[in-house]
Swiss-Prot record:
Main location per the UniProt record: membrane
GO biological process: proteolysis
Region Disordered, residue ranges: 579-612
Keywords for the protein's UniProt record, in alphabetical order: Glycoprotein, Hydrolase, Membrane, Metal-binding, Metalloprotease, Protease, Transmembrane, Transmembrane helix, Vacuole, Zinc
Protein name from the UniProt record: Vacuolar membrane protease
Binding residues annotated for Zn(2+) 1, in chain numbering: 171, 183, 243
Species in which this protein is naturally found: Neosartorya fischeri (strain ATCC 1020 / DSM 3700 / CBS 544.65 / FGSC A1164 / JCM 1740 / NRRL 181 / WB 181)
Length: 967
């Protein structure tokens, strides 16, 4: 039988150096661009595109963020007036009507609504919370050229005609401890630039466009909810929400309603995001919310949520400022907003129109759930979920059938060496057989997968126990530890297995196991797609498709082998038949001899050619004293055949017939697909979750996620890693040792990745006693509190049972109300109670000095409540099913008096007298920290905390003053 020839210097051969170099280069060639895309923001253009002015946008951001401007601050009023002024400047700077005629357009009508009339009472999604809120929203309506010219909103019963419009939303309030550059200053300046863009000739929208500058998002999405009470809210059917949950970087597509409304985002020059983030919101992995839930869930619109997502350590702190973001980040969000909005307002179809709804929500229709993801930040893929479901089901059925048919064809061709221990020669009576060792390597995969994965999971538990917050600042040290441990162990286990039982079928068996594992994962993913509408498992489909093709190629490779019977016939020569129970002098088998191995084997693992000095009995099995033991019918071993020059190591002799370059194709079908689809998800999850431990989230979860993602990313190496040289694995062993020590002992926070602690000062206005407190990761929060000058000699008490442990001390008294306004603390707020004599009802009037936010907190829930002059909307129930324990009151006026009527249940099991009683606290909030000395306890914290600590607000107010009442 002719033997195929193969040059030992084959650069694509399945030998150590080609395998090591090619796999390493492919991984680096994909990982490096993924890291660059994730961390480097595309540069803003040197000159502004037509209709935009990036210099104006950056200047606007600097003006907007020159102070804290929460809803309950005087700076917020200044921002409101500045926005109105800027909007009018942009409108007045629009070209004259003659310039529009040159592009066959008419100058659009623009209407500005300064909503200082709307209000709303509603209940929170959390049980027991009610909210009354007054609007200071600003809306800019750019009439579409396809729309009627009527001013329908001036009619109390008027409704828009024609197709629905588009809403773009950003909130102009910040938190009381952050300047709001990315949350949501970049969104605000993007909306300002959209006014400029869509009033430029050539860009006039087809559909009506509403730009909403809402106020009050940070305090419970209040601004978006009260927007529903303005007539213009009836116009939009689709929306784009611009938000910030980080402090720079790229703006990612967090979530979207469906595939149809997502497609306009494909126009973005640098799209970024994955549907997995939307599934994270649905699964509750991300606890914070945006106005998206109001527009989609409460109002019935269909839209997208685009937001900054990292770093969380700067989110809601004084580092959310213009200095810590960039013009490139502004451009990234602005360019996406322009492209998406232009796609929505130019849509001529009726796909965003639906039948009228009985629940009062917008009739925007419905679209199929979507699957979407970016490719290296340059392209964006969107398709419908049912398409993925159909493809998944098809692949689940077709792939096993293809392998089954191929196996049958191999068997009929007598070339099915897989799972075959031996073969009989042609015309044999069955008493003579040749060992094929075709089962070798089948049981390796479980060890290759389980041992490295188990160790990385163990590392996750180890780091969580000894240094749970290290990933907060050193995420790539954690990744390096996990990757180096996993790859080294996978290599070590595979090399041990290959040394003990060399097999040319390591690759095909490992691919077969991978096929089975990923088939099961695809079944699970497909079930979740169909049952729960979760599309985040789309990467499993692509990974399985690549693994299937690679596995199929391995099966097709077997057609290159000789027929088993033909091979056995050649090997089982009658002249070499041994006697039944005999011994003969022999030499040790090449599989059992290690001494002198280098003499017969080149560096690349191929065996040297036989010469006249080579032992004729090489390859025989020996027992003691070089005697071969043979029992029963003689079983010829393929190792008994003289050594072939192109045989790798001590693998089966028939393997020289297998193509030596096919592994490259198999690797390129598996690893790049996994890296392309899983790599961005790994980076996305790391960025989104690595700094959530300080918020009370589970630290173990993120480490387990890193361990699992490490397995997913490097599992394509398993069919090939036994061919690796020792250089990379030993280097990774050193990396593992260093990163393990670092991750266990290094301090987890730094000035660039600060620990966020949450401040509040609570004052009993009846007694004057106050307690300042910090909440956050323990024991760091206690150490920081103990380092403050005012806590020296105090007993700091810490409540460790809370989600965020809270440490309190007697604080420096606040000065949020000037002595001229109220000489005593109890005069900071006033209330009056009028109780019904016969029923468990009462009316409470509440007002506070130098504030426009107060609340009522009851010791037991009230059945119902109403706020004087408030609007009510059936889309927003205002009483929780289990009653209301807290009523938050917000006003656009300073020192406003709220009148609240409450009714509670009489306790029939106790005395009537006690049943008619209601007790609780009246609380007012102060949130303006712009002036030094107003909240000296906060000033002290900011001045004296370590550089690795950032300060955020714990609640709506920085200072909460309360007085008790009993009715």
């Amino acid at each position: 039988m002719a033997r195929p020839s193969l040059s030992r210097s084959n650069p694509l051969g399945f030998t150590p150096w080609p395998v090591t170099v090619i796999t390493a280069v492919v991984y680096l060639a994909l990982v490096v661009p993924l890291l660059v895309v994730h961390h480097v923001v595309p540069s803003a253009p040197s000159s502004s595109p037509k209709g935009l002015n990036l210099t104006e946008a950056w200047t606007d951001l600097q003006v907007l963020t020159n102070g804290f401007h929460p809803y309950n601050s005087h700076r917020n009023d200044e921002v409101h007036e500045w926005l109105l002024k800027r909007i009018l400047e942009l409108i007045n700077s629009a070209p004259p009507a003659s310039e529009y005629e040159s592009v066959d357009e008419a100058k659009p009508d623009i209407v500005v609504f300064d909503d200082t009339q709307s209000n709303l009472t509603f209940s929170g999604r959390a049980s027991g919370l009610g909210v009354y809120f007054e609007s200071t929203n600003i809306m800019v309506y750019i009439r579409g050229w396809e729309e009627d010219k009527e001013r329908w909103w001036e009619d109390p019963h008027g409704r828009p005609a024609g197709k629905g419009g588009v809403l773009v939303n950003a909130h102009y309030d910040s938190v009381s401890t952050g300047y709001g550059a990315t949350d949501d200053g970049v969104g605000v300046v993007s909306c300002l630039q959209l006014i400029k863009y869509f009033t430029t000739p050539g860009h006039v929208p087809r559909r009506g466009l509403v730009l909403l500058f809402n106020n009050g998002e940070e305090d419970f999405l209040n601004g978006a909810r009260v927007y529903s009470q303005h007539p213009i809210s009836q116009l939009p059917h689709t929306f784009l929400n611009l938000e910030g949950a980080g402090a720079g970087g790229r703006a990612t597509l967090f979530r979207s309603s469906d595939a149809e409304v997502t497609k306009p985002y494909m126009r973005a020059p640098h799209p970024f995001g994955s549907v997995l983030s939307a599934n994270g919101f649905e699964a509750g992995l991300i606890s914070s919310q945006t106005d998206y839930v109001v527009f989609e869930g409460d109002l019935g619109l269909r839209g997208l949520d685009v937001a900054f997502m990292e770093p969380r350590a700067r989110y809601h702190t004084d580092e959310d400022d213009a200095r810590h973001t960039s013009l490139d980040s502004v451009w990234h969000m602005l360019s996406a907003a322009v492209a998406t909005t232009e796609g929505l307002v130019s849509d001529a179809s009726g796909r965003f129109e639906g039948l009228p709804r009985e629940d009062g929500r917008i009739a925007s229709g419905s679209g199929p759930r979507g699957v979407w993801f970016d490719l290296f930040g340059s392209a964006f893929v969107v398709f419908e979920l049912h398409t993925l479901f159909a493809l998944s089901v098809t692949l689940l059925v077709v792939a096993p059938l293809v392998l089954l048919v191929t196996s049958i064809a191999l068997n009929r061709a007598d070339k099915m060496y897989l799972f075959r221990a031996s073969a009989s020669p042609e015309d044999s009576d069955g008493s003579e057989a040749v060992l094929l060792h075709g089962v070798r390597g089948f049981f390796r995969f479980p060890f290759l997968l389980v041992i490295p994965t188990a160790v990385t999971v163990g590392l996750a538990y180890l780091v969580t126990k000894f240094n749970p917050y290290i990933i907060h600042s050193s995420e790539y040290a954690v990744w390096s530890m996990m990757i180096s441990a996993w790859v080294f162990l996978a290599w070590f286990v595979s090399r041990v297995a290959d040394f003990a039982r060399p097999s040319a079928f390591h690759r095909v068996y490992t691919l077969t196991w991978l096929f089975l594992v990923e088939w099961v994962l695809l079944v699970i993913s497909t079930v979740y797609e169909n049952k729960y509408g979760l599309a985040g498992g789309y990467f499993v489909f692509f990974a399985f498709a690549g693994t299937f093709l690679a596995t199929w190629i391995s099966y097709l490779e077997l057609f290159a082998l000789p027929r088993k019977s033909e091979y056995a016939t050649q090997l089982a020569l009658p002249s070499r038949r041994a006697s039944s129970h005999g011994s003969r002098l022999g030499t040790a088998s090449g599989e059992d001899v290690e001494d002198g191995e280098d003499e017969d084997e080149d560096d690349d693992g191929t065996t040297a050619e036989a010469t006249e000095t080579t032992s004729l009995l090489r390859g025989q099995r020996t027992t003691f004293a070089n005697y071969v033991r043979v029992t029963g019918d003689y079983l010829r071993d393929d190792g008994d055949e003289p050594r072939q020059p192109n045989l790798y190591g001590h693998e089966q002799a028939w393997s020289i017939h297998l193509p030596k370059w096919v592994w490259v194709l198999q690797f390129l079908l598996t690893a790049p697909l996994v890296l392309t689809f899983v790599g961005p998800l790994a980076l996305l999850l790391t960025s989104a979750l690595r700094q959530t431990g300080q918020d009370g989230s589970s630290s173990l979860f993120i480490y387990i996620a890193v361990a699992a993602l490490t397995t997913l990313l490097f599992i394509p190496l398993l069919p090939f890693i036994h061919r690796y040289t020792h250089h990379i694995p030993l280097f990774l062993l050193c990396v593992f040792a260093g990163t393990l020590i670092y991750n266990l002992v290094a301090f987890p926070f730094s000035p660039a990745n600060r620990l966020k602690l949450f401040f509040i000062q609570e004052v009993d206005l009846d007694t004057g006693v106050n307690h300042a407190s910090l909440s956050g990761a323990y024991p760091f929060v206690h150490d920081v509190a103990s380092s403050l000058p005012s806590t020296a000699g105090q007993n700091i008490t810490c409540d460790l049972d809370l989600l965020r442990p809270k440490c309190s001390w007697h604080g420096i008294p606040p000065q949020v109300v000037q002595p001229a306004e109220a000489s005593k603390m109890k005069d900071w707020l006033s209330y009056n109670i009028t109780r019904s004599d016969a029923e468990p009802k009462a009316q409470l009037s509440i007002s506070g000095r130098n504030t426009r936010a107060c609340k009522l907190v009851f010791d037991r829930p009230v059945l119902s409540f109403t706020v004087a002059d408030s609007a009510y909307d059936p889309r927003f129930p205002h009483v929780s099913p289990d009653g209301t324990k807290e009523i938050r009151l917000w006003s656009r006026e300073w020192g406003h008096t709220w009148t609240v009527d409450v009714e509670w249940a009489a306790d029939t099991e106790e005395t009537d007298e006690k049943g008619l009683r209601l007790s609780g606290r009246v609380v007012c909030l102060w949130s303006d920290g712009n002036t030094a000395g107003v909240i000296p306890a906060l000033d002290e914290v900011r001045r004296y905390v370590p550089v690795w600590v950032g300060v955020s607000k714990l609640s709506d107010g920085l200072v909460e003053g309360s007085r008790r009442f009993e009715i």
